[in-house]
Amino acid sequence: MESLLKLLLLFITVCHRVSAATPSSPPPSSAPSYPEEALPTKSGYLTVNSTTGSAIFYAFYEAQTSYNKTPISESPILIWLQGGPGCSSMIGNLREVGPWILNQELTLDANPGSWNQIFGLVFLDNPIGTGFSIARSNQEIPRNQYDIAKHLFIAIQKFIALDKSFKNRPIYLTGESYAGKYIPALGYYIIKMNSQLPKERRVNLRGVAIGNGLTDPEIQVSTHAINSFYLGLINEKQTALLEKLQMNTVGFIRRGKWSEATDARNRVLDTLTNMTGLATLYDFRRLIPYQNAVVDKFLNNVEVKKALGVKEDKFFERCSNVVGGVLHDDVMKSVKYMVEFLVKNTKVLLYQGQGDLKDGVPSTLAWVKTMRWEGIPGFLEADRKVWRVDGKLAGHVQKWKSFYPCCCVECWASCA
């Protein structure tokens, strides 16, 4: 439990500090570049299909310092997966939790809240066809969570083989948004595979952490109207209209009309955006949208690609419409049963930014309450405690005190 709480503390610290990056890269030049000090420890490709050559791109940053007298070579490794579906983890790397934050001038600033301060940090462009990852054909892009997890498992095994010190290091899976499906599916797959493999081929999974995740879409899509109403963002008439659209979405889910359900959810979110006039549903307090187009500009530079081990002709797209289209029918399918499996077999952390109207606190707690897990009554009765970092309010934590804890964290500042 102690190791999970240390991980949790780092997550919350990032919520406060990620926006306070200090400039340390060279001034803007005519073309962006990757300063040597900002380069990943390792980056390149992990082949998932030796026949076709399809591969997952990775960028690994070794821990900056040791923690609690643990050598860096033994520190835990966090594997970050972005959402989408079809969005590159280089967004998380360069705009959220990586050691360097990309600014609008296409230069890099040191991130004092980076998650690799005391952990190794791996960013994977998942699934194939996303970001810098390679899919030799659209037909090879996975269409369900099982096949996505299978590719990721192969990639992780190959990553571990890159350095003999990686083999015994604890591994945690983390990410946000649509990774609320990737992470449970991958954790489930790893545990199942580990039970069938010899010790030397197992993945040393120690826990999972899901941020603002889409995990049980049927329940989560039903929370938007009432949540927005009680925040004062919409009135009763608008609430009734939104609830009607939500029930329409649920109807498609229950009839197994998955494509229609995804389209219906998109209508719910579009309607909510239009009703509120918000810049983004990911954080209702923001006055302008997230400025992430800078990631495409930076990563499509030839010198940057060369530095990362990417071919010059590989076009980077931060969110792939092709991958999103392939997984369109998968979006509204629940993986809650996989989380129910995980809480019995490893550590689970759910963390949410308080300002997220899509998959934030009410959305997450709504599906957590319906989990088939003997720990739920204890969890729901547990005290909700104030979380402080350096004496300042960081959020609130609720956990069930058992051998396999399930924690819910609310970030007072947005985690996204």
Describe the residue ranges of each PLM region.
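Terminal and linker regions of secretory-pathway proteins
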Residues: 1-416
